[in-house]
Regions:
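A short glycine-rich, Lys/Arg-flanked "PGG" loop and its adjoining helix->strand segment in the class I
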Residues: 106-121
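C-terminal alpha-helical "lid/dimerization" subdomain adjacent to the S-adenosyl-L-methionine
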Residues: 125, 129-184, 190
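Class I SAM-dependent methyltransferase SAM/SAH-binding core
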Residues: 23-82
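A short acidic, Gly/Pro-enriched loop at the edge of an enzyme's catalytic core
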Residues: 81-92
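Short beta->alpha hinge that forms the Motif I/post-I loop of the SAM-binding pocket
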Residues: 52, 104, 127
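A short SAM/SAH-binding and catalytic strip from SAM-dependent methyltransferases
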Residues: 91-105
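Conserved alpha-helix/loop element of class I SAM-dependent methyltransferases that forms part
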Residues: 2-22, 37
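Core SAM-dependent methyltransferase catalytic element
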Residues: 185-207
């Protein structure tokens, strides 16, 4: 992404900051990069990060310890479709580049709406397909040709790099994504396209 992902993340965290949340759930936290960024930008917040992969969480715990944030970030293995939290447990929920991997996206949104407090905000950042017919051919060439070739050079897991463009193309985008959020019980949904639409930030509230 040529470093653009850092800019996108800053914008997404700006959406989180607007609500001054005290308790944040970071879904699909992976190696905790987003959880750590949230903790640094919101010094009074406590962050819970969940992920299915214990291996990634182990890496995340080492990163959290190195950052000296063990008292503010808790990482645990959990399924986003069956969140192990009581109703209305969090002021804000974030998902960075994870919803396209949900097995059942609507069910995932319903679970997140369940554990979100009234007045709380959901912030999702996800890769997307540019809507512009002028940009789309270059984007498709990059995702379908450049990324898989680069993947073969740097990794033996070629499938992981070919899966990326497939998963981006398959996930709901724009109005279709906000419609799912609303069906799950969220309101005042909105989306903002970043960098010609290769990334989109979605927001919604629980009323």
């Amino acid at each position: 992404s040529f470093g653009l992902h850092r800019r996108w993340l800053r914008k997404a965290i700006g959406e989180v900051e607007a609500g001054a949340p005290a308790a944040i759930l970071d879904v699909a936290t992976g190696t905790a990069d987003v959880a750590i960024a949230l903790a640094r930008r919101l010094p009074s917040a406590r962050i819970t990060g969940i992920d299915l992969s214990e291996g990634m969480l182990a890496v995340g715990r080492r990163k959290v310890a190195k950052a000296g944030l063990e008292q503010r970030i808790a990482l645990q293995q959990a399924d986003c479709l069956h969140l192990p939290f009581a109703d209305e447990s969090f002021d804000c929920i974030t998902v960075a580049y994870g919803v396209r991997n949900f097995e059942h996206l609507l069910d995932g949104y319903r679970e997140m709406a369940r554990v979100l407090r009234k007045g709380g905000r959901l912030v999702v950042i996800e890769l997307s397909t540019p809507p512009s017919a002028l940009v789309r051919p270059f984007y498709k060439f990059y995702t379908r040709c450049v990324i898989p070739v680069a993947g073969r050079i740097v990794s033996k897991d070629v499938r992981a790099y070919s899966y990326l463009p497939e998963s981006i193309a398959a996930v709901a985008q724009g109005e279709a994504m906000t419609a799912l959020m609303e069906e799950a019980g969220l309101s005042d949904t909105a989306f903002r396209r970043m960098t010609f639409g290769v990334c989109t930030i979605y927001t919604g509230y629980k009323r």
